[in-house]
């Protein structure tokens, strides 16, 4: 019933987009650039964006996204997912996704092979076939609840192994893991870890939250991300990853200094400033100079208080903020 309710919500949004998308296309690049500016102001140095590919406006959004990212190429790194929002099979978008890959998208996307595409096997096989054809990574949005969701994850794991695509597949949301028994969640986590499938979560409020501590313990790479950022799907997104780390820590009761500090690695691609022995492990000479300076005494304070971001540096260049001489002397 939960998956049925969710799918009805999605189909309602799809119907809305049939009217909205053509009207918004003329301003797509401008809105994309505004979004990039927001993300940079919030400290982003690397972005993975899911770009709608659909039969309503074809590759119009992708064209606008590519143009916007070209404008910002010296300020942030980026990768684009060719995302068939209305269903790869449901909207007959297979050829569009292939065309998107040829145009410059980097990853093959998909959404809910069961409730949206209504054919788990065909949907997953098609996604993986496109990925292999274009030698591209995969990022699938999987909202399906409970055992339906975990069944889909296990099938994806098998296909990942068959294709030799270990380490190249991401499941966004993976909500099914939040509605199964601990035993089932452990088994799925172990299977995902075995084929190096990673998970991205928005740590949603009001839904069954996936067991991120369990996934982390089992060796599944977990990262945090934003879903909607003030669009017709939801008005609550901010684009602030530090806020996501804060929510993660609060949700799972990570309130001591060490746990709070470790929450930061879920938004830094796994980078930590200190190891378990308290030794500094980042930054080191030779590391890429892409980072954020924030007004905090330590990583734990930054997560707990969501401290002000003062400076964003990308590949050695300041892209947001100004560092004056007094502040520079205090850093040395």
Predicted regions and their residues:
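Active-site gating loops and adjacent loop-to-helix segments of metal-dependent hydrolytic enzymes
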Residues: 1-28, 152-170, 188, 238-255
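Alpha-helical scaffold segments that flank or form the walls of functional sites
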Residues: 1-50, 56-71, 96-102, 129
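Alpha-helical segments flanking ligand/cofactor-binding loops in enzyme cores
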Residues: 37, 98, 129, 189-190, ...
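Divalent metal-coordination and catalytic microenvironments
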Residues: 43, 108, 141, 171, ...
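Short, hinge-like loop/turn segments at secondary-structure boundaries
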Residues: 65-67, 97-98, 126-128, 156-159, ...
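Active-site core of metal-dependent hydrolases
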Residues: 79-91, 102-210, 221, 230
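His/Asp/Glu-enriched, well-ordered alpha-helical/loop segment
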Residues: 159-169, 213-296
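C-terminal cap of metal-dependent C-N hydrolases
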Residues: 283-332
